[in-house]
A protein has these predicted regions:
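Hydrophobic alpha-helical membrane-embedded segments
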Residues: 67-77
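Interhelical loop and helix-boundary elements at the membrane-water interface
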Residues: 1-6, 21-62, 75-176, 181-188, ...
Length: 235
């Protein structure tokens, strides 16, 4: 119980402090809603580090993620009813933040249970999520600014661009490869191949996912490709 409370305190402190700082910066510097959206995106990604470091066993992290899922609905109800808070973010479609947050937390729970609980490897939790998260955040910014060549494929989201998807692929590859090197147990050539295949699958998932579903789809796709390949190459 002591370990669980300590881990929960660390993870909660990170989330509260990071969000408070983001809101403070938004109020003081008047950054755009889109910039704040991406800031919160990276704050959520950062929460996986205390989640995988502060807890000593996987089921403590899974319980923490489950508690977050139980709390997020009333929190978002309050968010929508407090003028100071509801004015911080502009939804691109009705229920965007509720849906995105719920999917992000379910992705957190799934990756913790499968990668850490079943496979016994907390590093693969980070690799599965960061295969999507970092690239998605950067690719969105690149795509909006430089995405002049839209992907003309019937299964792809009409808003996706070649430039954004290439950026997604590069960031996904680098994220997975870096974490595999830190983790160890995989040769350099195998790490490159695993990272490239995981990045390609995640980029394809992000390209086809619509209405924010990439938040759940992409980490799951990355995990589905990454875990068998790591096992195959003796990791």
């Amino acid at each position: 119980m002591r370990d669980f409370l300590l881990g929960s305190s660390v993870a909660t402190a990170y989330i509260v402090i990071a969000i408070a700082l983001a809101v403070l910066v938004q109020r003081l510097c008047r950054i755009s809603s889109e910039a704040l959206r991406k800031t919160l995106h990276f704050i959520l990604l950062g929460s996986y580090i205390p989640l995988t470091v502060a807890f000593s066993v996987w089921w403590h992290a899974a319980i923490f993620a489950s508690v977050l899922i139980a709390l997020v609905f009333p929190f978002l109800l309050i968010l929508n009813r407090v003028p100071l808070l509801s004015g911080l973010l502009v939804e691109r479609w009705r229920g965007e933040y509720f849906g995105s947050m719920m999917m992000a937390l379910f992705a957190m729970l799934i990756t913790v249970c499968v990668c850490w609980g079943y496979c016994g490897d907390r590093y693969l939790v980070l690799a599965s999520v960061y295969a999507w998260g970092i690239g998605d955040g950067v690719a969105a910014l690149v795509g909006r600014r430089y995405g002049n060549h839209k992907i003309l494929w019937r299964f792809a989201d009409a808003h996706k661009s070649v430039e954004g998807s290439l950026c997604m692929l590069a960031c996904s590859f680098l994220s997975v490869f870096t974490l595999l090197i830190i983790r160890g147990g995989i040769s350099m050539p195998a790490g490159i191949l695993i990272s490239l295949l995981t990045g390609a699958a995640t980029t394809l998932g992000e390209m086809c996912a619509r209405n924010g579903l990439d938040t759940l789809v992409c980490p799951t796709v990355a995990m589905g490709v990454l875990l068998p390949l790591v096992r195959l190459f003796g990791g």
